[in-house]
């Protein structure tokens, strides 16, 4: 049982984030989350010598370093004892530990079968959504997920997993690509449109095929934007892509200036600190920062936030350079890292505990780090 949890604990943690996103299951998701955290913490305590070899493995030292930054911040720079901050500290450490243990003990599974699992699970979510709500054109589509942006995140990631497959595409793969594309566009997420565009460039480069796809895309953009819908094409063409982020960005910067050096605390990772006063003109609006980097600075302040972002960027750039030199650019996990760093300029990624895309980013970075270690060892 312990060995099984080491191998698949991360998978359970990742899939549970989807339960958080479905209104009918979001009441049981916290129970599952705390159960997984409790089991993980107990195993860390009762097997310190065995787990130490994994946590201190050179591939996962960057995760340990982030956990140490969290610990130092919590002990010396939290304005007052905060149970929510303590829970964040422990949850992040256990989450990182489960990621490290799963990769270390089950690397071949994540190399060969994990992508297939992601595609199957998200396919089920999308198909169930179409049964419950088949009308893709009446407003922003969200299926069985509580938020259209969350559905867009799932569907566009599944689209990327299918697109990046190295095996010859089957008819089912083509059908899934079309399905995930249509659902992603129907959500009205402009970020989904950006990720799809980047995924084609990443996979095929600036080839004649991509030029052809771009022409088709512009034709679709023109045709669909002339119809009164609320798809990603319509929202992209009718608005400046940054226009509804300007107020959010400025408000976040104003909040950061109030606690510039040490931020609002570990528990404030949403991009909107809970104790700030929202101006009357923003009442009723979603005024979180919608920027992962700003959210880190709001959480930690400039000093500790700089260290966190430096660790992320250094590791990401080092791994990107390595795998591109090795001509392994089509690695799906490398794409997840790159696109998350880009998407974090428009969404609050990188900081959350129970957010699918964020956890997948930390896993991808860790997987690539361990993969690099194995390849270096073979060489």
Regions found by a protein language model. Name each.
Residues 142, 238-250, 254-300:
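Long extracytoplasmic/lumenal interhelical loops at the membrane interface
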Residues 102-105, 109-137, 146-206:
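Alpha-helical transmembrane segments of multi-pass inner-membrane proteins
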Residues 58-61, 169-173, 205, 210-213, ...:
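Hydrophobic transmembrane alpha-helices and their immediate junctions
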Residues 1, 11, 35-51, 156-166, ...:
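Hydrophobic, aromatic-rich transmembrane alpha-helices
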Residues 32, 37, 59-71, 80-105, ...:
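Aromatic-anchored transmembrane helix interface
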Residues 1-47, 65-79, 92, 129-133, ...:
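N-terminal signal-anchor transmembrane segment
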């Amino acid at each position: 049982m312990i060995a099984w949890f080491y191998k698949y604990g991360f998978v359970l943690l990742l899939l549970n984030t989807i339960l958080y996103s479905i209104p009918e299951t979001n009441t049981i998701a916290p129970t599952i989350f705390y159960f997984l955290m409790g089991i993980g913490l107990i195993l860390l305590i009762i097997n310190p010598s065995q787990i130490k070899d994994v946590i201190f493995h050179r591939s996962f030292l960057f995760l340990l370093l982030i956990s140490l930054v969290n610990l130092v911040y919590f002990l010396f720079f939290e304005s007052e004892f905060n149970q929510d901050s303590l829970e964040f500290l422990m949850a992040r450490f256990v989450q990182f530990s489960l990621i490290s243990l799963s990769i270390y003990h089950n690397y071949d599974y994540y190399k060969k079968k994990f992508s297939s699992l992601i595609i199957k699970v998200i396919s089920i979510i999308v198909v169930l959504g179409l049964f419950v709500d088949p009308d893709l054109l009446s407003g922003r589509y969200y299926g069985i997920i509580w938020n259209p942006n969350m559905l867009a995140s799932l569907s566009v990631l599944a689209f990327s997993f299918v697109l990046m497959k190295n095996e010859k595409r089957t008819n089912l793969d083509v059908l899934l690509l079309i399905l995930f594309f249509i659902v992603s566009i129907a959500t009205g997420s402009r970020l989904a449109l950006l990720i799809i565009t980047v995924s084609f460039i990443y996979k095929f480069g600036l080839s004649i095929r991509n030029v052809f796809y771009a022409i088709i895309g512009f034709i679709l953009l023109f045709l669909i934007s002339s119809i009164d819908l609320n798809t990603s094409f319509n929202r992209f063409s009718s608005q400046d892509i940054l226009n509804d982020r300007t107020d959010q960005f400025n408000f976040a910067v104003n909040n950061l200036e109030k606690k510039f050096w040490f931020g609002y605390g570990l528990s404030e990772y949403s991009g909107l600190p809970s104790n700030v006063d929202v101006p009357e003109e923003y009442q009723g609006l979603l005024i979180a920062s919608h920027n992962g980097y700003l959210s880190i600075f709001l959480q930690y302040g400039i000093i500790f936030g700089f260290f966190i972002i430096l660790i992320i960027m250094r590791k990401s750039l080092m791994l990107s350079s390595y795998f591109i030199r090795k001509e392994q650019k089509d690695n799906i996990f490398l794409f997840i890292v790159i696109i998350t760093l880009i998407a974090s300029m428009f969404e609050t990624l990188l900081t959350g505990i129970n957010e699918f895309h964020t956890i997948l980013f930390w896993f991808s970075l860790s997987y690539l780090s361990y993969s690099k270690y194995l390849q270096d060892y073979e060489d």
